[in-house]
Amino acid sequence: VSFARPHSPYDPPQRYLDIYKNAPVPDPAIGDWCDKYAKKLDPEKAAQDAPYGNFGNEYARNSKRHYYANITFIDEQIGRVIQTLKKKGMYDDALIIFVSDHGDMMGDHYHWRKTYPYEGSTHVPYIVKWPAADHIAPGKIDAPVELRDILPTFLDVADVTIPADMDGRSLLPLAKGTETNWRKYLDLEHATCYSDDNYWCALTDGKIKYVWRIHTGAEELFDLTKDPQELHNAVNDKKYKKQLEEMRNEMIRHLSERGEEFIKDGQLVVREKTMLYGPNYPEK
């Protein structure tokens, strides 16, 4: 089941928006690294799909209210699906995975919408309701999982052989506590979109995040355990020197199979152009 909401435009039905009309909403998170976007802008004069912009805290809070209302709308629709499964006697046998393909920055660090390596854009829900026959107790698993794991999981639960060349891995052994060799990091990456410097690769285990800007060579390092809102880029902090080197080396190993366009002489290569070629991006 696929829903367009809560994707922009933020247009919830009015009765859901009324729920959040006077609700307290936090201001956006603003890091010490995003001054280039800090200039105050008039939202009435900005492009409707502006990817960056400081439109003020009240604008950001109002956007969040609309976003929250859309999420509540979706929650109610999912509830209808679940109630229908229960009425038909199908719920106990069902495997349900609730995920999203991306989040939304909602003004954090003066960024809007998606395609960024930051938590607002990348850290999405991943909720699994297992069939009763699998006897998996409710709980939270602290492991890096990704959307590519969905299909192998469904095949595994259905007792169908998972092809060896399939991307992703079944979550069932992880949920049962029998998985002993799970992935260490998630790979995040994006080709040029919105601006030339929005071309990046990142690695994270959910505790530390390393970002490599492929056009510029700029690096970012966030300690998500101590700084979950990514308020401080620790790339120049001496106390994070070892972790920076470790994550950089992990990125080198990760990208090495792609050849000299990405890694040369054991070093990350700054690319002048993106790998994104197409009629809409003739100069990229």
Question: Predicted segment positions?
Answer:
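C-terminal cap/loop subdomain of S1 sulfatases and analogous C-terminal strand-loop tails that border
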Residues: 102-108, 148-151, 156-220, 224, ...
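Residues that form generic nucleotide/phosphate-binding pockets
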Residues: 19, 23, 174, 250, ...
